[in-house]
Curated annotation (Swiss-Prot):
Organism expressing this protein natively: Yersinia pseudotuberculosis serotype O:3 (strain YPIII)
EC identifiers of the protein: 2.8.4.3
Residue ranges of the TM segments: none
Keywords: 4Fe-4S, Cytoplasm, Iron, Iron-sulfur, Metal-binding, S-adenosyl-L-methionine, Transferase, tRNA processing
NCBIfam families in alphabetical order: miaB-methiolase (TIGR01574), MiaB/RimO family radical SAM methylthiotransferase (TIGR00089)
Protein name: tRNA-2-methylthio-N(6)-dimethylallyladenosine synthase
Catalytic reaction annotation: N(6)-dimethylallyladenosine(37) in tRNA + (sulfur carrier)-SH + AH2 + 2 S-adenosyl-L-methionine = 2-methylsulfanyl-N(6)-dimethylallyladenosine(37) in tRNA + (sulfur carrier)-H + 5'-deoxyadenosine + L-methionine + A + S-adenosyl-L-homocysteine + 2 H(+)
Domain Radical SAM core as annotated: residue spans: 143-375
Length: 474
């Protein structure tokens, strides 16, 4: 009888990536098949996030529901991973004894052994250690699910912003070897992936080892990925301004595969607040980066993160943030009211901003950025946009839907054979959350660049010798 696995994922794209790897890993080692119904599962996994407020309460609320399922089925195994698990460790089991497995972001590759331990000994296991990059060496080959894919290139962060838990839950920065990354992307390209999103908590700090003992910079990695035939779009998330060096900006000048859209978190427009956050840059320095980017790629759109109501934020501080929003003309943002994360330096700061004031500021900020996003969308009417077709439209299965470089959903009339390919469409109308387009040309009529086939990348990157040790084949 087939064993079923249910995974609940909260949080960032890195967590989504990790959850997909868990599913692939447990399918290969234990034969688990995914189910969307928790009641059907033999194994329940919760991949948690601790960035936002009340993360712990949210976890224990769901575990209370899963406890009832375990009372009905004592053989059910419950596992909790991610950043809350990394923070709480053994204390998590003290509040939720129904949990059998507790693992951190860096130990998900050990899940098969942990599950075996529970099944053989009927005792729980906790592993929230930081074994650096080991997990990537023990995960199964990537499996494409559509024309887009996430690829993790590094883990952790060394910046220690005062509001952030990432360095404590995911560890400090560790970069994957460049050839391992190219090997994974080439495998995905061979399966039909056309767009990759390179992931890392501080992705532009990437410094990966090469086969010959050298170091590959993030800018160099971007060019190597762009050279793989079939990979015609590259995104990356998330960046830090102090690591956004000129060599990365130069890639925007000469590498069209790198999309004209960048998510670059700034958090605040007030230098005083940025200093309290330990962001290590000023608002003016952030604007200088954007100015150079727009010189290299005039049509680039910028999105960002904002924290409203950081401890001690005055009305003047907030007005400086709003000025930055207007000056940069952000397209979209992920903006939140500040909530203290246990164990971070900012959690000890006196919070003298009222909840009502925080909510009002957040509303003003989000409303302004929404207006700017609509202005950008309206300017797209009459333009020709290259769209990667992802599938049928949500509202009309007789139509297709895809995304532009700046992440706009476009619905248009087309044929099913276009799914997974690029098309050029003329934008004719704008809606609140999508655009309407008319098909102009298909991929067969385009001149997409071809540099190196996925098969040749696979052939020249990581191989294994007779005892399973990775070797490089030039």
């Amino acid at each position: 009888m087939t064993k079923k696995l249910h995974i609940k994922t909260w949080g960032c794209q890195m967590n989504e990536y990790d959850s997909s790897k868990m599913a692939d890993l447990l399918a290969s080692t234990h034969g688990y098949q995914l189910t969307t119904i928790p009641e059907e599962a033999d194994l329940l996994l919760l991949n948690t996030c601790s960035i936002r407020e009340k993360a712990q309460e949210k976890v224990f609320s769901l575990l209370g529901q899963w406890k009832l399922l375990k009372e009905k089925n004592p053989q059910l195994i419950i596992g909790v991973g991610g950043c809350v698990a990394s923070q709480e460790g053994e204390q998590l089991r003290q509040r939720a004894p129904c949990v059998d497995v507790i693992f951190g972001p860096q130990t998900l590759h050990r899940l098969p052994e942990m599950i075996n331990h529970v099944q053989e000994t009927n005792s729980p296991v906790v592993d929230i250690s930081f074994p650096e990059i080991e997990k990537f060496d023990r995960l199964p080959e990537p499996r494409a699910e559509g024309p887009t894919a996430f690829v993790s290139i590094m883990e952790g962060c060394n910046k220690y912003c005062t509001f952030c838990v990432v360095p404590y839950t995911r560890g400090e920065e560790v970069s994957r070897p460049s050839d391992d990354i190219l090997f994974e992307i080439a495998q995905l390209a061979a399966q039909g992936v056309r767009e990759v999103n390179l992931l890392g908590q501080n992705v532009n700090a990437y410094r990966g080892a090469t086969y010959d003992g050298d170091i590959c910079s993030f800018a160099e990695l971007l060019r190597l990925v762009a050279a793989i035939d079939g990979i015609d779009r590259i995104r990356f998330t998330t960046s830090h301004p102090i690591e956004f060096t000129d060599d990365i900006i130069d890639v925007y000048r000469d590498t069209p595969e790198l999309v004209s859209f960048l998510h670059l978190p700034v958090q605040s427009g007030s230098d005083r607040i940025l200093t309290m956050m330990k962001r290590a840059h000023t608002a003016l320095e952030y604007k200088a980066i954007i100015r150079k980017l727009r010189q290299a790629r005039p049509d680039i759109q910028i999105s960002s993160d904002f924290i409203v109501g950081f401890p001690g934020e005055t009305q003047q501080d907030f007005e400086q943030t709003m000025k930055l929003v207007a000056d940069i003309h952000f397209d979209t943002s992920y903006s939140f009211i500040y909530s203290p994360r246990p164990g971070t330096p900012a959690a000890d700061l006196p919070d003298n901003v009222s909840e009502e004031e925080k909510k009002q500021r957040l509303h003003i900020l989000q409303q302004r950025i929404s207006q700017q996003a609509m202005e950008i969308s309206r300017k797209m009417v009459g333009t020709v946009q290259r769209v990667l077709v992802e599938g049928t439209s949500r509202k009309n299965v007789m139509e297709l839907a895809g995304r532009t470089e700046n992440n706009r959903v476009v619905n248009f009339e087309g044929s099913p054979d276009m799914i997974g390919k690029f098309v050029d469409v003329e934008i004719v109308n704008v809606y609140a959350s999508s655009l309407r387009g008319i098909l102009l040309r298909t991929e067969d009529q385009m001149d997409l660049r071809t540099h190196e086939s996925p098969q040749s990348v696979i052939a020249r990157t990581r191989k294994e010798n007779e005892i399973g040790v990775g070797i490089y084949q030039p």
